[in-house]
From Swiss-Prot:
InterPro entries: Aldolase_TIM, OMPdecase, OMPdecase_AS, OMPdecase_bac, OMPdeCOase_dom, RibuloseP-bd_barrel. It comes from the Bacteria. The gene is pyrF. This is Orotidine 5'-phosphate decarboxylase. It comes from Staphylococcus aureus (strain NCTC 8325 / PS 47). It catalyses: orotidine 5'-phosphate + H(+) = UMP + CO2.
Length: 230
């Protein structure tokens, strides 16, 4: 996978995606999430790949093991670069996801969502009824993902250093919640700058609105890219 900032294509239509991608004359690493995939379907993935871009298909699969395994068999045929599941589904579910993926695809990396970067300590305790710190909850889910054989996790940059210490440098830490200095926090709570994410051990960063909603997306992307790749 490219070591580039992953741009979250948080658009509702293929037309808006193409308008955005047409601004760039270089190969990108982009994220297609539920909103866009459910609107446009697999054909959009094929078109983005044909343009030479890497794709993170962010569907966060979470169901019984058999269902997730079968779903991953279908997604494997899209030949994206990165897919994910929810670690809360457990080791068996994650193992079945890998089996389904590998039936048709040996190259796609698979990672697990630990805790969303919108999660707060209060939400963790009172809504999820998890009576530990966010850091401990993330570590527990990351250990389950590692035990299942996944390539890494989605986590906040604030947990990256801990996960590197516990699970090694090759374990992927894909981190949303990235905001350049002075940018709006939006609905993210556990955030850092690109430079801080690199220093903390993130292997990849995901950036959406600071690029896609910028007055000059190309310039904003290059600034984030430069600060990430220092």
């Amino acid at each position: 996978m490219k070591d580039l900032p992953i741009i979250a294509l948080d658009f509702e239509s293929k037309e808006k995606v193409n308008q955005f991608l047409d601004l760039f004359d270089e190969s990108l690493f982009v994220k297609v999430g539920m909103e866009l995939f459910y609107q446009e379907g697999p054909q959009l993935i094929n078109e983005i790949k044909e343009r030479g871009h890497d794709v993170f298909l962010d569907l966060k699969l979470h169901d019984i093991p058999n269902t997730v395994g079968k779903a991953m068999e279908g997604l494997a045929k899209l030949n994206v670069d990165l897919v994910n599941v929810h670690a809360a589904g457990g080791v068996k579910m994650m193992s079945e996801a890998i089996k389904g993926l590998r039936k048709h695809n040996q190259d796609t990396k698979i990672i697990a969502v630990t805790q969303l970067t919108s999660t707060t300590e209060d939400m963790l305790r009172h809504e999820q009824n998890i009576q530990t710190s966010i850091e401990e909850a993330v570590l527990n889910y990351a250990k389950l993902a590692n035990a299942a054989g996944l390539d890494g996790v989605v986590c906040s940059p604030l947990e990256s250093r801990m996960l590197t210490e516990k699970l090694g440098t090759s374990f992927l830490k894909v981190t949303p919640g990235i905001r350049p200095k002075g940018a709006s926090q939006n609905d993210q709570h556990r955030i850092t700058t690109p430079e801080e994410a690199r220093q903390l051990g993130s292997t990849h960063i995901v950036v959406g609105r600071p690029i896609t909603q910028s007055d000059n997306p190309v310039e904003s992307y290059h600034k984030i890219k430069e600060s990430w790749l220092v």
